A protein has these predicted regions:
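Active-site anion-handling motifs in enzyme catalytic cores
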Residues: 1-207
């Protein structure tokens, strides 16, 4: 490749170890569009009541689901998931967790934009929560201890949102309605976006 970039520190480190080349860390492509751009692709979901969106790698952890059930009762809001596997759905019913009828990226973004509280366990869940200015929390799972997976940690640090990272055990001990001040976050995202466009323009111009 004539040009190469990565979005995380580990990727930069591994490429340097393998090739001796230090590549730049550039924003994920999803950050190159503004919230206004993304909102043109979706529509507000027609859920009349306030609700919590839970977006995770998997939904089969009974301990986590028990906590989420208590969260739903505490805030008097149902919890919705999207794209849950069919064999998980019957297990989620007993916790009062609902499966949204739509799926895919557009369904997820539409649901996220409408949610009152967003609980995520993914890099892109954090990205879109920040772009849409959501009251969100990034969940760390004690079961997953992959130190090489730094995606969530890095994007939280890049945007100044480190305090939004919590464990499932914290969900009942803090006020999940705590708003996020997105003033500085927006500045940081715009700086990341500008750096990315500058890099893209450099290789398009053949520099």
């Amino acid at each position: 490749f004539d040009y190469l970039s990565v979005r995380e520190n580990n990727g930069q480190k591994w490429i340097k170890e393998l090739t001796g080349i230090e590549v730049p860390i550039i924003a994920d492509p999803t950050l190159l569009l503004t919230s206004k751009d993304w909102l043109q692709c979706i529509k507000t979901e027609e859920i009349e009541e306030k609700f919590i969106l839970y977006y995770s790698f998997f939904y089969s952890n009974e301990y986590n689901n028990e906590i989420l059930s208590e969260v739903s009762k505490k805030y008097k809001m149902p919890i919705y998931i999207i794209d849950g596997k069919q064999w998980n759905i019957h297990k989620l019913d007993k916790y009062g967790i609902r499966l949204w009828k739509k799926s895919g990226p557009v369904g997820l973004l539409s649901l996220m934009n409408s949610a009152s509280i967003v609980l995520v366990q993914s890099f892109h869940g954090i990205v879109f929560s920040a772009l849409f200015h959501k009251t969100f929390w990034s969940l760390r799972n004690k079961v997953i201890k992959n130190v090489n997976d730094d995606r969530a940690r890095v994007i939280l640090a890049q945007t100044g949102l480190e305090k939004r990272a919590i464990c499932y055990d914290d969900l009942l001990n803090i006020d999940l309605k705590q708003d996020v001040d997105y003033t500085e976050v927006d500045v940081k995202i715009q700086q990341m976006r500008a750096k990315a466009f500058e890099y893209i323009e450099s290789f398009l111009d053949g520099e």
